Each structure stands twice: as C-alpha cells, then as structure tokens.
Amino acid sequence: MAKKQDRKRKVKDEATNDGASGSDQSDNAEEEEDLLQTVKEPGEDSTDDEGIDQEYQSDSSEDLEFESDEEGNYVGRKGGQQESSDEEEVDEEEEDDDDDDDEEEGGKVEDKPTTSSKAETNNEVAPLPALPARDPSKQEYEDSDTSDEEDIRNTVGNIPMHWYDEYKHIGYDWDGNKIIKPIKGDQIDDFLRKIEDPDFWRTVKDPQTGQEVVLSDADIALIKRINSARIPNAEHEEYEPWIEWFTSEVEKMPIKNVPDHKRSFLPSVSEKKRVSRMVHALKMGWMKTTEEVEREKQQKRGPKFYMLWETDTGREQMRRIHDPVSAPKRDLPGHAESYNPPPEYLFDEKETKQWLKLKDEPHKRKLHFMPQKFKSLREVPAYSRYLRERFLRCLDLYLCPRAKRVKLNIDAEYLIPKLPSPRDLQPFPTVESLVYRGHTDLVRSVSVEPKGEYMVSGSDDKTVKIWEIATGRCIRTIETEDVVRCVAWCPNAKLSIIAVATGSRLLLVNPKVGDKLLIKKTDDLLAEEPSNQDIIDNERIKTAVQWSTAEAAEQEKGVRVIINHFKPIRQVTWHGRGDYLATVMPEGANRSALIHQLSKRRSQIPFSKSKGLIQCVLFHPVKPCFFVATQHNIRIYDLVKQELIKKLLTNSKWISGMSIHPKGDNLLVSTYDKKMLWFDLDLSTKPYQTMRLHRNAVRSVAFHLRYPLFASGSDDQAVIVSHGMVYNDLLQNPLIVPLKKLQTHEKRDDFGVLDVCWHPVQPWVFSTGADCTIRLYT
C-alpha cells in the first residue's frame, strides 16, 4: 500500500516536472521504499525503558487529509481522489506500471519474513469512494428548497386569494400594476376544451395570477412520485456509500513522558514535623479525638427539641408550643340520631326521595344519615359510618390549623352614624295646618308667589286656582281647555306672572292679586310686542312653537300670552331672573326641550340631537348652566359655551324630578324606584348619598330657599322632611338628617303625593295629592 502511494506521488511529480528522467524516478522510488522499511531485526524488542513501543509505521498522513475548493466545498481526499484531469494521467501511468509493481513486490516479499508480509496485507485499507466535484460557479441555493429565487408575478404575499373575489383584479405585479383576472368561460367552453384540447388533463389554474398553466412532463413525473410516496427528486440516491470520515482504530500514545522527580521517592519533611507536633500534643493531653470533641459540643448545647414537620422559629409556631389550642369538641348527638326518635324527626316519602336523589352530592344533604326507629336498643345494628367518621376526625385533628378568634361584641348603635337630635335642628314642619279643598280631580302641581302671600295650583279637572295662603280661600279659578300638567309662578318679585302648561299650550297669566301697580306693570309688559324684524326664525323653531296674544275671552280670565307647542307639555320652569322659561315635551324627540325669552318673545331649541327621553329640565341659580334629566342620566350644559360640562350617573331606572340647592353646588334627584339621590357637583359624577326613605315611587323633591331643609313626596302618601346642611368649608361633607314623616294624604288609584313646594320665607311645605287636596305643613 505504501509503495502504491509512492507511485502516485511519483506520477504526480512527473506531471509537474516534465524534464525528469525515468531512471531517476526508479531510484527515488527505491530510496523511498527503503525509508519505509522496518529497521529492527527479526525477534528484536522495540520497546524503550518506559515500556512504550518505539516502532511506528504509519500510513501517509495525506490519506487522512481532505481537499476543498475556495468556497469550502468538499472535493476529495489528498492522495486518493484528485481533480478529473490529474486522475486520468495517474490512471494511465498506473496501468503501465502495474506489472513492474507486481514483480518488485514479489521479490520483496520473498526476501522479507513471512510475518511482515502478513502485516502489510492486513494494514492495507480499501480506497474510499470518490465524491463528485462541486462546481464553484454553481449557485449555492440552485437546487435547494428556498423560495427566494422564485419568479413571483403577484406580489400580494401569502394571503387568502378569496379576498379579491369582489374585485376585477387579483393582485399587483412588480411594477405596481393591477393583474386583471382572466375571462372565465362557462360550462360549454369547459366541455369543448375537454374534447378538443389534448393538454386539458394537465392544465391547472394558478391561484396567484388566475392564469391556466400546462404542467410539463417533469411536473407530471414529480406528482406521480409524490403520489406513490417516493422521494420527489429522481436523481437523489437513498443508499449512498458510507464515507468513513474518522478512522475506527484507536491509537494509544502517552501525552507526556516526563520522569518522576526525586522528591517523590523521599519522605516529606513537613509531614515529619507535623507528625512530631501531633505526637507531642497527644503526650501532653492537648489533642482529643473526634468523638471527645463531639461529646463536649453536645454537652454545651444540651438536649434539642424540634417540630416534626417544620421549624419552630416563627411566631405562630412558638405560640403553638407555649399556648396550644385544644381541639374543638364534636357536636353532641341530637334527637334525630336516637334509636327511638320522635315521629316528627322521621322522614316521610317526599323527604326520603329527596335524600336519595342527592346520592351524587351528599354534601347538600341536611343529615348524612336517614333517621330510623327501633323498638329496643338491642335491635340497633352496627354503625356503618363509624370507621369513616373516626378517620375524618383524625384528619381534622392533625391536618387542620387551629387559631383563636376573638369575638367582637359590637353594639348596633355603634354602627349608626352619630347625628344631631331633630330638636336641635328646628324649625321644620311637624304638623298639618291647612287643607285647601276645591279641586275635583288630581292636583298635579303647586307654586307659591315670591313674597309668600298667594299660591297657585293646577289639576286634572282643567282648572287653575289661586289661593290665599293664610286663610285658605280660593281667590280665583281659571278654566282651561285641557288638563293642567304644571304651574310655575315667576320668581321675579317685580312681575306677577304665572306660567300654566295645559295640553300643548303654555299660558302666561296675570293673576291680578297683590299690588295693583305691579299688576298694571305686568299687563304693560305682556301687551307690548317687540319688533323681531331683524331676527329670522329657523324653520325648526316655527314648526315647533308659535307665540300669540290671547283673545278677548281669555283676556278676561287673565291670560295674556299663549305659546303654542307641537306636542303636549309636561313641565315648565323659570330662570331666576324671570325673563327665561323652559318647557319639556317628552314626545318631541330632538325638540323636547325649548327655552323661551319673555322680553323678546323668542324661542330657542338648544339641542339638535336627542340624547334620550327628557323628563325634566332646570336652570342653575347662579351660573349659566342648564340641567337636563333623561330617564337614566343627568347632563349639565354650559349655555354660553354651548358645550357639555358634566354627566351625572344616577344608576336608577327612571328619574321623576330634581331640585337644586340655592348655592348651586348640590343637586337632589327623585326616582320612580323609591330612591332619592344627593349629588355633590364638586365631588363626583356619582351620588354622594342614596336615601331609601319611601316605600313607593318618589315623585317630587324640593329644596328650601332659605333654610337647610328639603322635602320629598311619594306614592306612599308620605311627605318626608329632612335636614340638609351645606357648609362653606369645602372639606366638610354635607349633613343629611331625616327629620319628620308627614302622612295625611289619602291614596287613590295607587297615587299618593304628586308634588311638594316650600314657602319662600317660612319653613312651611305644601303638598298636592291624588285626593284632590292641597295640604300645608307648618
């Protein structure tokens, strides 16, 4: 084998050096052959003093090296597989010299001993199979699975193509132009193509471009191989010859062969000194054995106690040691567990079926057993659950944690907030003083003159009555064409005007009571019609409201101005200055709320969109703000900036009414779900306090203008007077104390108190009810 390798080297040198002679080559070959001969005599030992075999005859190191091209691709083994051009030349030379090699080797074998020839025969290694040379110019990913080099016409990416079903195009090309879908044929076209086109069976549709593609023979072959569960590439060889990259022969050689140092053979001087010191310590009694040392440490530590499951260094663990908690005692047996229980403890058929029905859910049973009755104690059988109950008891004793809980004996009065006594909060109404009778149907609304001398009421009997508060005498009755829903006296003391909402008309009435000069001034103001030539009204306003002067017949009743609306009016409210008033029409959609100006006889629609079914509106007493209450929420608008300021969340089903504190920082809301809500406008958009003082729907609430009082009326025929103090200190919360429950109205058709109103000067409250009366509480 070595000689054959030398031949190959010689042939390669001949290819590189053309001027070398044939005789020199043979001499060089003989010299190289002599260099590889063994140098020992037969039977001579080749091991050295350390027992290492110095005889080492190795194959050429070039057989274990490999060649690669510039790109790092495998080309072949050095001395084994060369470039294609070199291989042809070497093969030709080897064919010519095969005979000479055989003769020379035969002579050599005859001269050498038999053992050496066998060794050479065994050491010969079969040549490794040649690998195909790789072309460096070939692209790295030419035959791989990468899709980077694919020619993709449609650049939409990996998306579902059915997204383009609604469009005429199916994607975009590299230039950004749309790829138009091809024309689709019908079933007849498909049938003709199936008959006439010989390539119809190998035609498929490209989902990316929508074009029809004819499969080539290579594609058909690839599909067939995949369908038959074979490797797609036909050129791929599954069973390639194994290349032994690493030799299987283990070579044992020493890493280093350094002789031992002299001190390794001599005793250690330091150990000698240490032993002498230890001997001296033993003689003097200074040194002790390990057992003696451990015994002394144990005596110092003393006996050691520890918990079975965990350490006892924690506070709870120390408490368990020093202050153990005894196990709770089992409950004593009851009458149901007796062998002869009373008949009422035995199950009937219904209870027995229910007990057996809960077999899969035994924890839902009231008793874990079924009571039985025996004539005598000796007839009682063994208890089947005895072992299980003992086992569960043991589990509870050592697995369940124990703790002492101090029972808090809290007095109920301690939980009630400390409120001042009602006697300290006087004055407030306590008794019924007057009953105003005269209406024949429900009295829905009541309002008091700013000076507190007269009162006006509206009823379902289509009348408006003006009363003298002190005497209870009805001074005047004004008949209307429809049910009176709401009445409101102008808060401006310089005017004597009553706004009456009856049906879809709003009547401005001069009651003709009180100061005659004031009555004449009011008539002059209402009789004067301002010139609105420069003002162009919107069509929405014209169709929603119309101003007109009352006719002679109504003038005699005191009606001066009539404002006709397009829907029935439910509520009317005045601004604090008495020049503006607002009306509510729940059926008016986005025109439900209207604001009227008395001096200019103009109307405005503040909202263009409906935010809900409007129930009532209110003017702020100090700021230019407008409160709008829908069924569930309350919105506060700025009339100057014309924007929403705040939205109050009531968390109620239906709002019935609202009233604002004279200072303007607190709002009281009544709801049909038996609640009263107190809102602190500076604090939050949610109720500061929710009061459930009534048993039925709360229909009306009202603040007093001077005293810290508010009242509420409900369908339970009760008027509840409460104390509501608002402090100037913003850090102090309002004080709310219920004071008195006044219940004198009669209930009719499930209706009770419909409206409440405070006297502007005195701590008196008026209430109207379904019993056709108006009652004064003082």
UniProtKB/Swiss-Prot annotation:
Keyword check for rRNA processing: yes
Biological process annotations from GO: maturation of 5.8S rRNA from tricistronic rRNA transcript (SSU-rRNA, 5.8S rRNA, LSU-rRNA); maturation of LSU-rRNA from tricistronic rRNA transcript (SSU-rRNA, 5.8S rRNA, LSU-rRNA); regulation of hemocyte proliferation
GO molecular function, one term: ribonucleoprotein complex binding
WD repeat start and end residues: 438-479, 481-519, 564-606, 609-647, 650-689, 693-732, 748-778
Xref: SUPFAM superfamilies: WD40 repeat-like (SSF50978)
Positions of the UniProt region annotated as Disordered: 1-152
Sequence ranges of Acidic residues compositional bias: 44-53, 60-72, 84-105, 142-151
Ranges annotated as biased composition (Basic residues): 1-10
Pfam families the UniProt entry points to: BOP1NT (PF08145), WD40 (PF00400)
UniProt similarity note: Belongs to the WD repeat BOP1/ERB1 family.
Protein name listed in UniProt: Ribosome biogenesis protein BOP1 homolog
UniProt organism field: Drosophila willistoni
Lineage, top ranks: Eukaryota, Metazoa, Ecdysozoa, Arthropoda, Hexapoda
